[in-house]
Every structure is written in structure tokens, then in C-alpha cells.
Amino acid sequence: MNEFAERIERDFPVRRKEKEKVDFRTWLVYTLKELGYSPKLESGTSALSAGGNVTNVVVGDIEKAKIVLAAHYDTGVREVLPPLICPTRPATYMLYEALIPLLALAVSFLISFGVTFALNMPNMTLPLFLLLLVVTLFYPKYGKSETNNKNANTSGVIALLEVAKALTPRYRGEVCFLFLDGGTQGSKGASRLIHAHPELKKKSVVVLDCVGEGDELLILPGKASRWNDKLLDTILEQFSNSERKTCFLKTDGLVHYPSDNHAFMGGTVICACKKVKGFGRCILPRKTEEIDEENLSLLCDGLCKLVMYYNPQNT
């Protein structure tokens, strides 16, 4: 197992509550310093549902970096239904997500109807139904934490650490690494950084999310990045396939990936997918048993070359 993956899975598998994240950040900062970097903590006033405020870990100079690599390190609440992401089939993903509130409505109604029917109190059905709905609103804050976070998004953090480790001192000043907080809560960490560093709006930001399992590394440029010919050409030239894995840059069609990439104007997201009949390219984070080291190797190699050869001045 990858050395970073082993340590994180052993000591910091859940990073949702404030103490869990503080412990992880302490290790992360120490590890980055051991690799020769000077990480900084940047905190904001945005409150998080599980307590504490947004705290990002920034490695490098955002203003001087020619490219930014990012991944969120926080983990979320355990969803009622197994998480499913279909990047190239947005309608399928949104319909699946819509099942959660519908399920909450159905369960709340059945419980309220069953209880009031058994007690012969039909007038209390609606009040109890509404009360149960209010209770479900507090689930994101008080619900059980997701425990299997290998793919979402321990894999993205590990990939960043592998790139940081592999880069020679000559190229380290040309990249900025962002370890983002609040990724599971509307990209609060990314939004905080953009507010503090407006120059991020002009940067090419590559976000890594759910890269730990899948036969295809799917690269999805955002609306602005689709017109960045230099970035796309460099990705095509520097990312390579292996015997079992492919890297696919998708620049056409309707796509949607629910991560921090949407916060950045020049955002591009990289994820790892497997093809599931009826759903197309899919990511099933909860089913991941182990992070695929071949994925990490391909990503690390491609991203290191991207840092070395990408020249935004020519765009």
C-alpha cells in the first residue's frame, strides 16, 4: 500500500469534525515540511456544519504559480443512499440525488401515518409528519460520519502528496498545492480562497477527486478551460495510458462533476471512472476497498509533466 495512504487510513480515516481535521492537518503540515515545502494554514469565518471554521492548507505562492493543483481533504456525512456520480450523464446523477429528499418524504409520511393510526390520533398525522421532516434537516450536522473515504477524497490528497514528493526543486516554485476544507459542504474552502486570493480566478486549477478506483482517468475541463488550448494540448501530450488504464480528455458534450472544480473559473477536474451498464461512466466511492496504485502512478507522472511543460503565457 502507498505510504501516504497507509498512514491516512490508519490514523485519519475520517476528517469531518474539527478535532479530526486538526489532527490530520498537523500531520499534513509536518509531512509537507519533511518533503521540503513551507505549507501555510489559511482560515476563514465560514462555519461548517460539523463544527469549526474553514481551514485550507496552501503550499506555494498562488500569485506566482503557473498552475494550481487542488483536492479537498475533508470527509462528509454518511449518505442514506450509496453515493453515485455519473460525470457524463448529469441527468442520471440528478435523478439519483432527487431520490434522497423523496425517500425522506416517504419515510416521514409512513412513520407519522403508522404511529397516529396505531394511537387512533389522525389529527396528529400532519404535525408529526412536519416534525419528522424538520428532524431530517439536522442530519447533515448530527448524522453518522462516512467511514469509507478511500476514494472520496483520500485518493486526491494522496495524489497531491505524490506529485509534491516527485517534483524536483527546479519546478516546485511553478506550482501551488491547495488542500481544501469544506469540499463536502458546497466547496466552502475553495470559495474562501478565491475571496482571499482573487488572482485564482485567472489561474488554471486542476482538481483531483475520486481518483482511487477505476479503469479510466477522466479529465473534464470546465467551460473556460475548454478554450484554453495550451492547457488542453499539454494534457494531451503529457498524460499517457498504460496497459490496463486509459486517460481520456473529454471536451465535448454535457458533463457535470459535483466538486470544487465549479468554484474555480479555470477549473478542470480529474476523476477515475468505471463503466457500468445503464449508467455509463460511474464512480461508486463507498465500494472502494483499496486505492489503485497504478492510478496514482499515472496521475503523478502526468501532473508532474504538466507542471514542467505548461506555459500559460502562450495562451
Q: Model segments located where?
A:
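Active-site-adjacent substrate-binding region
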Residues: 34, 45, 214-315
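N-terminal capping segment at the start of a domain
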Residues: 1-23, 29-31, 35, 48, ...
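Extended, hydrophilic extramembrane loops/domains of integral membrane proteins
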Residues: 66-81
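A non-catalytic alpha/beta surface segment that caps or lines the substrate-entry region
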Residues: 13-63, 80-116
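Acidic/histidine-rich catalytic neighborhood of metal-dependent amide-processing enzymes
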Residues: 113-230, 253, 260-261
